[in-house]
A protein has these predicted regions:
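Short, flexible active-site loop motifs that bind/organize anionic cofactors or intermediates
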Residues: 19, 75, 153
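An anion-binding loop in the catalytic cleft
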Residues: 79-176
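Active-site loop ensemble at the mouth of alpha/beta enzyme cores that anchors a bound cofactor
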Residues: 67-68, 73-84
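Donor/substrate-binding cores of folate-linked one-carbon enzymes
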Residues: 1-72
Length: 176
């Protein structure tokens, strides 16, 4: 992008479309974008130097704006849809991380999947249902989050099974 006074407003000097893989988190997406930029940097700089670059004007009506990300944005609201929770996991993978609390200790979720399903009305959102072959099953408003790996504050990253076997009281408890 060509530098102008306004933020992210200059003409585009290089652009390439690619499909974002469904399982990408922000770190993986950043690495993919870095690799694309690195592969095309020399060619783009040469075109700028010999003035053969074709500037592409941005359509400012398509611009979107967001707020600054705060650490508290990573706190899971178990009343949200499981799909939204997984999107936040992908978006906040580098910072602030997606986290919840158990026994007043912060747990950072490192890897998880969502399965949409009918839930029992007797289970509470954020309740840990079981450890199964998909991970630690936690009830959401519209299904189950299956945590594959997580990190208790002050500890190393663990797979779901290792975490639960060291903390059997974790199953059936509630996260907040």
């Amino acid at each position: 992008m060509k530098m102008v006074k306004e933020l992210d407003a200059g003409p585009i000097l290089f652009q390439e479309k690619f499909k974002i893989k469904e399982n990408y988190n922000s770190e993986q997406l950043g690495l993919e974008l870095f690799n694309i930029a690195a592969q095309n940097l020399n060619q783009t700089v040469k075109k700028i130097a010999d003035e053969s670059i074709k500037e592409i004007s941005q359509d400012h009506s398509l611009a979107t704006y967001t707020n600054m990300i705060k650490k508290s944005d990573g706190l899971i609201n178990w009343a949200e849809s499981g799909e939204l929770i997984i999107r936040k996991l992908k978006a906040y993978s580098q910072w602030p991380g997606l986290y919840t609390y158990w026994n007043d200790k912060r747990i950072i979720i490192k890897d998880a999947d969502f399965q949409k399903e009918e839930n029992s009305e007797f289970e509470k959102n954020g309740q840990i249902i079981e450890l199964n072959d998909k991970g630690i099953a936690i009830k959401t408003i519209d299904g189950m989050i299956h945590i594959k790996s997580l990190q208790l504050e002050g500890s190393k990253i663990m797979d779901a099974s290792s975490f639960v076997h060291g903390r059997p009281s974790f199953i059936s408890s509630n996260l907040n």
